[in-house]
Amino acid sequence: MSQSLIVALDFPGKQEVEQFLHHFEGEELFVKVGMELFYKEGPAIITYLKEKGHKIFLDLKLHDIPNTVKSAMRSLASLDVDMVNVHAAGGSSMMKAAIEGLEEGKQEGKERPICIAVTQLTSTSEAMMKKEIGIEKTLEEAVAHYAKLTKESGLDGVVCSTLEVPKLREVCGNEFVTVTPGIRLASDDVNDQVRVATPKRARELGSSYIVVGRSITKAENPLEAYKTVKQQWEGVTV
C-alpha cells in the first residue's frame, strides 16, 4: 500500500483506533495522529502504532517562541515519528529552531523526522483570511509567501490545499514536499473544509502526500474505501 497516502486517525482514543486498524491487519500504513488522539493517549499511542509497523505523521502544529518549539521538537523526535509540523506564521526563527530540536532529539542512526509547515488551514477561505486574520494578499499569494519562507528556513515542505500545489512547485521547486489534506471522494460531504479535492485531482495537481480521514475512517468498509482512494491517487488498479 502507498506510503504517500496518509490516513488521518481522527479518533477520540486508542479503543477506536484499535477497532479501525483491525480492518488493516498485516498492512503497514502511514497514519496521522492529531491533537485529539495525542492529547488523550499521550506518547503511548505512538509506541503502539510503531509496534504495529505504521509510519506516523504527528500533527500538532506547533506555534510558540523559538526556544519552546525547539525543546518540544527535541521531545517529539525522540518518539521516532516520521513527520511533524509547525505553523509557518511562527516565523523563520521558530522554524529554524524546530529543525535544531529535531536534529538534537532524533534517535541514533536515524534521520530526523520530515518537518513541514502549515500555510493556511484548509478551513480558511480567502474572505476569512482577509477579514479575520488581516492578510490582504490573495490566498495563493499568502500560501506562496509562507512556503518560500518555510523553504528558506530549512524545512522540507508545507501543508497546503491541492489548489496551491502548482504555484508552490513554481516558487519552491519539485523537491519541496506538499502535504495536502481536504481530500474527499466525489461522493462525500466536504464537512468543515473549504478547499477540497478528490485523490485523482490531487495527483493531477502534483501533491507529494495526501491526507484522507472521513472518506476512509467513516466508511462502512474502511479497507475497500482505502483501496478506492489509493486507486484514484495512484492511477492504478489495486
From Swiss-Prot:
A Pfam family of this chain: OMPdecase
List of residues binding substrate: 10, 32, 59-68, 122, 184, 193, 213-214
InterPro entries with a match to the protein in the record: Aldolase_TIM, OMPdecase, OMPdecase_AS, OMPdecase_bac, OMPdeCOase_dom, RibuloseP-bd_barrel
Key words, A-Z: Decarboxylase, Lyase, Pyrimidine biosynthesis
CDD domains named among the record's database cross-references: OMP_decarboxylase_like
Active site: residue positions: 61 (proton donor)
An annotated Gene Ontology molecular function: orotidine-5'-phosphate decarboxylase activity
Keyword presence, Isomerase: no
Keyword Cell division: no
GO BP term (any one): 'de novo' pyrimidine nucleobase biosynthetic process
EC identifiers of the protein: 4.1.1.23
SMART domains (UniProt xref): OMPdecase
Catalysed reactions listed for this entry: orotidine 5'-phosphate + H(+) = UMP + CO2
Pathway involvement of the protein, from the record: Pyrimidine metabolism; UMP biosynthesis via de novo pathway; UMP from orotate: step 2/2
Family: Belongs to the OMP decarboxylase family. Type 1 subfamily.
Job description of the protein: Catalyzes the decarboxylation of orotidine 5'-monophosphate (OMP) to uridine 5'-monophosphate (UMP).
Subunit structure, interactors included: Homodimer.
Protein name in the entry: Orotidine 5'-phosphate decarboxylase
Gene, per the UniProt record: pyrF
